């Protein structure tokens, strides 16, 4: 990792050069430097919504596909890529059936 000697910003590799995105300073990359990119993703625990936790969720008018009741708890969860919309989950306040709705 190298920082620009002019503006102290982080420099990035572009081909065989190091370039400062902020001020445009360029420097030949040293052959002895090896670029290693490591990406790690942490799996987050998905909270389970049940029992007393349900009573804290907002409710809305939605027809349950199982019993036809017209009220359900709802919550949003990001299941797909960050550039895609969230998934809306519903749980019937009467029978407990859970279903989802995509935008």
Curated annotation (Swiss-Prot):
UniProt keyword annotation of Transcription regulation present: yes
Record's keyword annotation contains Oxidoreductase: no
Zinc finger regions, TFIIS-type: 60-100
Domain of life: Archaea
Family annotation (PROSITE patterns): RNA_POL_M_15KD, ZF_TFIIS_1, ZF_TFIIS_2
Matching CDD domains: Zn-ribbon_TFS
ZnF (C4-type) residues: 4-23
Binding site for Zn(2+) 1: 4, 7, 20, 23
Residues where Zn(2+) 2 binds: 64, 67, 92, 95
Main function: Induces RNA cleavage activity in the RNA polymerase. In its presence, the cleavage activity of the RNA polymerase truncates the RNA back to position +15 in a stepwise manner by releasing mainly dinucleotides from the 3'-end of the nascent RNA. The truncated RNAs are able to continue elongation. Involved in transcriptional proofreading and fidelity. Misincorporation of nucleotides during elongation of transcription leads to arrested elongation complexes which are rescued by TFS-promoted removal of a dinucleotide from the 3'-end.
Family named by the database record: Belongs to the archaeal RpoM/eukaryotic RPA12/RPB9/RPC11 RNA polymerase family.
Protein name per UniProt: Transcription factor S
Natural source organism: Archaeoglobus fulgidus (strain ATCC 49558 / DSM 4304 / JCM 9628 / NBRC 100126 / VC-16)
Phylogenetic placement of the source organism: Archaea, Methanobacteriati, Methanobacteriota, Archaeoglobi, Archaeoglobales
This protein's encoding gene: tfs
């Amino acid at each position: 990792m190298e920082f620009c000697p002019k503006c102290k910003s982080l420099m990035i590799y572009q081909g065989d050069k190091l370039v400062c995105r902020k001020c445009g300073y360029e420097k030949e990359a040293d052959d002895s430097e090896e670029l290693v990119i490591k990406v790690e993703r942490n799996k987050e625990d998905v909270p389970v919504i049940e029992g007393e936790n349900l009573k804290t969720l907002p409710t809305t008018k939605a027809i349950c596909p199982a019993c036809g009741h017209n009220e359900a708890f709802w919550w949003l969860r990001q299941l797909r890529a960050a550039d895609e919309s969230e998934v809306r989950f519903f749980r019937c306040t009467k029978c407990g059936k859970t279903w989802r709705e995509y935008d």
